[in-house]
């Protein structure tokens, strides 16, 4: 039994106890054939910290491009194939080119700081003045490309972060 099943069954048992219904024989479990499981391979960077990534880039084991590609592949695996989570609305079409540029800066001895070459997702209500749209999760703003970066987006770019894409959220980010 995994954590989600435990929490679900605990909630059902609590609700039945409040209603005064007997628990024995009342539990109904979905048939095994109705539960869809996805075999999602583990992600090698899942528990990796920014400090770990910086160390790997400094030693030459990883590059900003290789890290960015790993994250793009993972987004495609979870959003477009497999469980189709749709947790990322769009990815930055320039992410790999930006990563290449930051790798060149690193080779030239210029590292902007601890975020240099680190891919980051932004919520879709943060303006980015690039080829990504900002919709705040609303169809009314579909195709909206801001004229200027939001303050946080500009600061992240200046620090060398790679704005990888926009994360999904509810309409108008409420």
PLM-predicted stretches and their roles:
Residues 16, 27-174:
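Gly/Ser-rich catalytic/binding loops embedded in alpha/beta enzyme cores
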């Amino acid at each position: 039994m995994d954590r989600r099943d435990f929490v679900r069954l605990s909630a059902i048992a609590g609700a039945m106890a409040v209603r005064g219904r007997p628990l024995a024989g009342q539990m109904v479990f979905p048939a095994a054939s109705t539960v869809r499981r996805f075999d999602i391979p583990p992600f090698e960077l899942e528990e990796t910290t920014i400090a770990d990534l910086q160390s790997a880039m400094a030693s030459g084991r990883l590059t900003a491009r290789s890290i960015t590609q790993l994250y793009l592949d993972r987004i495609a695996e979870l959003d477009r194939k497999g469980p189709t989570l749709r947790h990322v609305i769009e990815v930055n079409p320039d992410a790999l080119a930006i990563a290449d540029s930051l790798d060149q800066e690193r080779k030239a001895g210029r590292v902007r700081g601890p975020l240099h070459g680190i891919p980051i997702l932004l919520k879709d209500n943060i303006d980015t003045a690039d080829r990504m749209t900002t919709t705040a999760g609303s169809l009314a703003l579909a195709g909206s490309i801001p004229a200027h970066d939001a303050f946080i987006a500009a600061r992240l770019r200046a620090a060398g972060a790679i704005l990888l894409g926009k994360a999904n959220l509810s309409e108008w980010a409420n």
